[in-house]
């Protein structure tokens, strides 16, 4: 049997879990969750390197490919899917690839993560020059993800790993290894818990910081958001109102005249 990954360890605080009350289970989970932000904080130097690589890639016309399996794959697809409405970018700028394809977003595809060859093939079909390939695997041992990183290494400008195990094959294979050591889970091996939370936090940081550094915001305002529903149109009105000093009706009129583009409305006001 191969060496047990750190994500498969037993948490001594959960040894008596079967006898815990509901309140005790919830408090233990909450206690464990509170250790995650500190673990992410320790990984910021590597996260910073990854963000700078992504910013450089985007400036050169590159894209970001997230590759994962199971929970890790779903989190990658989630982050990628939020980039267009949040930052007004094309859907391909951040692109999620998950073992087993789109069906795996809703249900478990048994064995999908076990094929290194399929990971290599799927990424090789999608990757282009100047892209950054981000492999996501809590254990760092999912063959599909390791293969995916290898599939992009000869084409992509950089490869990045997000994992919880510093000695894993994924960490060793990447140009930049983001290692968030969260320790064993309340349920041994259930990496959808702390490891999943850590992964989501890291992905938030990668895409958000990269977009800020790429000029897709104005300060803390999402001026390139796509105002496709009532909530987002109200948000757009507030942004234009707050920046320009226009009243709400004038801000809305300006947005309507500029196709509901906050950036265009602000530029129109600047030129008045």
Task: Put a short name on every predicted segment.
Residues 28-36, 96-106, 218, 233:
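Gly-rich Lys/Arg/Thr-decorated short loops/hinges at beta-loop-alpha junctions or inter-strand turns
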Residues 42-57:
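A short, well-structured juxtamembrane/interface segment
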Residues 1-39:
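Cofactor-/ligand-binding subdomain signature composed of acidic, glycine-rich
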Residues 8-12, 48-52, 63:
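Short, positively charged patches
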Residues 32-42, 107-108, 132-135:
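Short, basic, glycine/proline-bearing loop/turn elements
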Residues 64-201, 210-214:
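Glycine-rich phosphate-binding loops that contact phosphosugars or nucleotide phosphates
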Residues 210-272:
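Short, amphipathic alpha-helical interaction segments embedded in low-complexity terminal/linker regions
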């Amino acid at each position: 049997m191969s060496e047990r990954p750190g994500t498969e360890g037993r948490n001594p605080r959960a040894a008596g879990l079967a006898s815990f009350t509901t309140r005790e289970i919830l408090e233990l989970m909450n206690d464990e969750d509170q250790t995650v932000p500190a673990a992410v904080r320790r990984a910021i130097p590597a996260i910073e390197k990854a963000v700078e690589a992504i910013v450089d890639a985007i400036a050169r016309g590159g894209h970001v490919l997230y590759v994962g399996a199971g929970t890790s794959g779903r989190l990658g697809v989630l982050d990628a899917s939020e980039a267009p409405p949040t930052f007004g970018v094309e859907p391909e700028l951040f692109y999620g690839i998950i073992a087993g394809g789109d069906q795996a977003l809703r249900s478990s595809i048994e064995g999908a993560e076990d094929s290194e060859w399929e990971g290599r093939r799927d990424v090789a079909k999608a990757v282009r020059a100047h892209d950054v390939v981000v492999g996501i695997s809590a254990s760092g041992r999912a063959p599909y993800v390791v293969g995916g990183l290898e599939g992009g290494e000869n084409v992509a400008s950089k490869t990045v790993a997000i994992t919880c195990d510093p000695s894993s094959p994924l960490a060793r294979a990447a140009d930049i290894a983001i290692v968030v050591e969260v320790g064993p889970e309340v349920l041994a091996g259930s990496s959808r818990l702390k490891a999943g939370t850590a992964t989501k936090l890291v992905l938030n940081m990668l895409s958000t910081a990269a977009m800020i550094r790429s000029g897709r915001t104005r300060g803390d305002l999402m001026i390139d958001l796509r105002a496709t529903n009532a909530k987002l149109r109200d948000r757009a009105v507030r942004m234009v109102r707050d920046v320009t000093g226009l009243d709400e009706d004038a801000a809305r009129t300006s947005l309507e005249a500029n196709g509901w583009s906050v950036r265009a409305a602000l530029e129109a006001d600047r030129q008045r």
